Amino acid sequence: MSEIRFRLAKPSDAKEIANIHWHVRERYTQGIFLSLGESFLRAFYKIILDDPWEVTVCAVNEKGKILGFANTTMDAKKQAENVKKHKFSLGVAALGAIIKHPSLFKEVWIRYKSLSNSKNAPSLVHTEGVRGEYWCWLKDDDSLKSVEMSNIKNEILYDLGVREMFFEVDKANTSVYKYHLKVNRAMPVEEITLPNGRVRVM
């Protein structure tokens, strides 16, 4: 088994991080981000990894290849503002997927509106406080290390003073949903049905 080490991800890792997220579709194909393609993911992570409130831990093998990552924003409101500030570049990156599948435009628009703290905004993700985001690992590598990686990320957050974190999990993502309930002992706050019919637990 190859040696795996953990470190904080940097903006220069955006391409590899996006590639790992893209390969999640080998196990789970749902989600607007996967629908928008790898080019969009690269543009997104280039922005996210440069956000001062982002904590992203990645796992790296002895060849320097990133095998997985887990990330959390310590300020979901600031992150939403940052994403909206880059809406043009993200829109351009998503354009190819939207041209191929015009129905995606409605989903993208709803997701964009959900970034607002307005009472009328769609409730799809948490938009305030500390928000857990993605936890991804390449399919053919030592996935047990992914749990260690996630725990390290959470320990860093704890050391930084975080005592409460919100996140969302689609019920269809059965293994992750059960892990958070039974192992992480996460407490469901709300269950919603997304416009595309997916059931999401927050």
Tell what function each PLM region has.
Residues 27-44, 84:
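Conserved GNAT-fold acetyl-CoA-binding loop/helix
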Residues 58, 65-74, 131:
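Conserved beta-strand in the GNAT
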Residues 43-58, 74-82:
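A short helix-loop-beta-strand connector motif used in the catalytic cores of GNAT acetyltransferases and
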Residues 127-132, 157-171:
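Conserved GNAT acetyl-CoA-binding A-motif
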Residues 4-20, 74:
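A short beta-loop-alpha structural element at the N-terminal edge
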Residues 78-134:
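Conserved acyl-donor/pantetheine-binding loop and adjacent beta-alpha core of acyl/acetyltransferases
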Residues 129, 133, 137, 141-158, ...:
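Conserved acetyl-CoA-binding loop-helix of GNAT-fold acetyltransferases
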Residues 152, 171-190:
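Conserved active-site alpha-helix within GNAT-family acetyltransferase domains
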